[in-house]
Amino acid sequence: MAVIKMTDLDLKGKRVLLREDLNVPLKEGRITSDKRIRAALPSIRMAMEAGARVLIVSHLGRPVEGEFDEAFSLAPVAAHLSRELGRDVRLVKDYIDGVDVAEGDCVLCENVRFLKGEKKNTEELGRRLAALCDIFVMDAFGAAHRAQASTHAVARFAPVACAGPLLAAELDALERALDAPKHPLVGIIGGSKVSTKLTLLDNLSHRVDRLIVGGGIANNFIKAAGYEVGKSLYEPELVEEAARLMAAARAAGGEIPVPLDVVVGPELADGAPATVRKVSEVGPDEMILDIGPATATRYREILLAAGTIVWNGPVGAFEWEQFGAGTRALCEAVADSPAFSIAGGGDTVAAVEKYGVASRVGYISTGGGAFLEFLEGKELPAVAILQERAAQS
């Protein structure tokens, strides 16, 4: 992808505005997962070691725009960064008129959503943020699908606008998986509702060689194939759409395989009994909550023969142990496959971590919504503006 990269620039002595995604989950002021901070650390260290004067910018949560709210302060993030970097990382509340930072040092700017105009992507705020730096570095893939002042407008007006190492790695992995994949290309799409991933399913059904569907989404395809789904979650109005997608995949020389067997239960609850059924034998009072062992074996064969795997969403309700075997088997198959694999989305990342295969997945995306929108074939505004700036340089 034609963007300027931070790694290609001389940062020494330059004021670098580094947009990261440090939107971490908090409980009673404590960080419950530092995954996003850890993902950003290499870029922060790289900029500092290059002698840049680094101003780190991020959002956190959804405060009322333009108003300071202690509950959404980045103070816990500043403390965490200080520990990780082994130096005091100052949290600057009033930074919009400029901040003095020494070469090779960094400060953390307070939650950018406290500034009026951030969400509306105003030119005024974009210009003011751009005035803080010599180089703007967009490194927050998780926010790349949002056109906001700190991801988009600032890139229009900064003297130089480039992609940080984390964003560049995300784009390289996605391009490798979708634009120049080694075939067979296999997509795995799970989740509860077809309606939330219709664009994604439509886009991938024309591009992949095989599309494995799981979770509540699969129930629509099971129904479209002529089987009963009992009390399972499905969307009656989208069964015809599922049939169309299956036909479209076949017409393109691909396939959306329907499960051979499933795991059912009377309800989704702790202690609910789990029973394996042929897909043709689901009872009227049963819910499909996972794929069965024969299906897991079939999907494993498909994944081991793949050249590229793109994965978004589990195939069962893996949060409940008795309905997690299918997702576990899928995790292990992706990990064992010689294919280049990319996984993204909160539930998917949680699954690969739960089953201990994260280190054997080719690339784990840090973006939820951005990952999904890229797979849907949509333009990511924060990336598009970097491409535009690169074309002008």
Curated annotation (Swiss-Prot):
Record's keyword terms, sorted: ATP-binding, Cytoplasm, Glycolysis, Kinase, Nucleotide-binding, Transferase
Principal location: cytoplasm
ATP-binding keyword on record: yes
Catalytic activity: (2R)-3-phosphoglycerate + ATP = (2R)-3-phospho-glyceroyl phosphate + ADP
Lineage start: Bacteria, Pseudomonadati, Thermodesulfobacteriota, Desulfovibrionia, Desulfovibrionales
Subunit (UniProt): Monomer.
Family matches, as Gene3D superfamilies: Phosphoglycerate kinase, N-terminal domain (3.40.50.1260)
EC assignment: 2.7.2.3
Pathway annotation from the record: Carbohydrate degradation; glycolysis; pyruvate from D-glyceraldehyde 3-phosphate: step 2/5
Sequence positions that bind substrate: 21-23, 36, 59-62, 113, 146
Xref: PANTHER family: PHOSPHOGLYCERATE KINASE (PTHR11406), PHOSPHOGLYCERATE KINASE 1, CHLOROPLASTIC-RELATED (PTHR11406:SF23)
UniProt-listed GO biological process terms: gluconeogenesis; glycolytic process
Family to which the UniProt record says this protein belongs: Belongs to the phosphoglycerate kinase family.
Pfam families in the record: PGK
InterPro entries for the chain: Phosphoglycerate_kinase (IPR001576), Phosphoglycerate_kinase_CS (IPR015911), Phosphoglycerate_kinase_N (IPR015824), Phosphoglycerate_kinase_sf (IPR036043)
SUPFAM superfamilies documented for this protein: Phosphoglycerate kinase (SSF53748)
Protein name, UniProt field: Phosphoglycerate kinase
Subcellular location as annotated: Cytoplasm
